[in-house]
Amino acid sequence: MIMKYFCTVMIAIALVGCTATPPPTQKAQQSKVSPTRTLDMEALCKAQAAQRYNTGAQKIAVTGFEQFQGSYEMRGNTFRKESFVCSFDADGQFLHLSMR
C-alpha cells in the first residue's frame, strides 16, 4: 500500500518538474555609440598619439575599434609602424594611451 502511494507521488513530482518552463536567458545589452561620437573619439586618439610619438595627426592611422562591456578601445599605428591602443570609458571619455 505504501509503495503504491510512494510511486504515485514520485511520478507526480517528476511530471511537475518536467512541465516547469525554464526562466528566460538574459542577454547583455549593447549600447550603440553614435557615428559622430566615434569620429570624435578617433580624432582625440589621433591627437593623443601624435603628441606621444611627436608627429602629426595625419601620420597616425586608426586600424580598429572594439567595444567591451564598459569601455571602448581604438587600435592604431604610426607611419613608423609603432602600435598603440587608446582606451575610452563607457561615455566615450578618453582614459589613456598604451604603447604596444
Swiss-Prot record:
- Tell me where in or outside the cell this protein is found: Cell membrane
Pfam families in the record: YsaB
N-palmitoyl cysteine lipid attachment residues: C18
Q: List the keywords (alphabetical).
A: Cell membrane, Lipoprotein, Membrane, Palmitate, Signal
Q: Signal peptide span per the entry? A: 1-17
Give the matching InterPro entries.
YsaB-like
Entry's Gene Ontology cellular component terms = plasma membrane
The way this protein sits in the membrane is described as: Lipid-anchor
Q: Where is the lipid attached (S-diacylglycerol cysteine)?
A: C18
User: What is the protein's name according to its record?
Assistant: Uncharacterized lipoprotein YsaB
Recall the taxonomic lineage recorded for the source organism. Answer: Bacteria, Pseudomonadati, Pseudomonadota, Gammaproteobacteria, Enterobacterales
Gene designation per UniProt:
ysaB
